[in-house]
Design a protein with these regions (language model features):
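N-terminal cap/leader regions of alpha/beta-hydrolase-fold enzymes
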Residues: 1-174
Length: 174
């Protein structure tokens, strides 16, 4: 992990910013139901951000980060990776994510990412980006080469050359 479980995003909240947020369930094309946290500015912009968390999946850090993006005019949705193995309910800070991470696949993570991208497109987000951290950083690079029609991808602490049971992001893009 790149930071403690009780960390907050380094970007301060904008006092008085008008945003909406909700926990929701998305359905991927393969039938997986996944948890997601959506934050939208009350005056929608044209940019959407899919947040791809670290190995711990969806928790408060990424919910707060989605809110910070929305306060700055961007719709943001943070997804959870563990719908296939742990269900789509919310989990506490003591969640044992390790066994669930081991069961993820690139195809599953990308199906979930595509569901989030499509949800943002349904909100009229024209330019959509992925921003991922650690495990999600790698997933962000893979998303760039997976045909989601993204405007860009940012991977923080992720490796574009590491493989997880399939071609690496670099190989997918070749």
């Amino acid at each position: 992990m790149c930071f403690d479980i009780d960390s907050s995003p380094p970007v301060p909240a904008i006092a008085g910013a008008s945003v909406s947020h909700e926990l929701l369930k998305l359905r991927a094309a393969d039938g997986n139901e996944l948890a997601a946290f959506l934050a939208t500015p009350d005056e929608p912009g044209r940019t959407g951000i899919v947040l791809l968390p670290d190995v711990r999946g969806l928790y408060h850090f990424y919910e707060e980060l989605a809110l910070r993006f929305a306060e700055r005019g961007h719709a943001a949705i943070a997804i959870d990776y563990f719908g296939r193995t742990a269900g789509s309910s919310t989990r506490d800070d003591d969640f044992e994510y390790g066994p669930h991470v081991d069961q993820t696949t690139d195809d599953g993570v990308q199906a979930d990412t595509r569901a989030a991208v499509e949800h943002l497109r349904g909100l009229d987000a024209g330019s959509i980006f992925t921003v991922g951290f650690c495990f999600g950083g790698r997933a962000s690079w893979v998303a760039a080469a997976s045909g989601h029609g993204l405007s860009g991808s940012v991977g923080l602490y992720g490796s574009p050359t590491r493989q997880r049971g399939g071609p690496s992001a670099v190989e997918r893009g070749a």
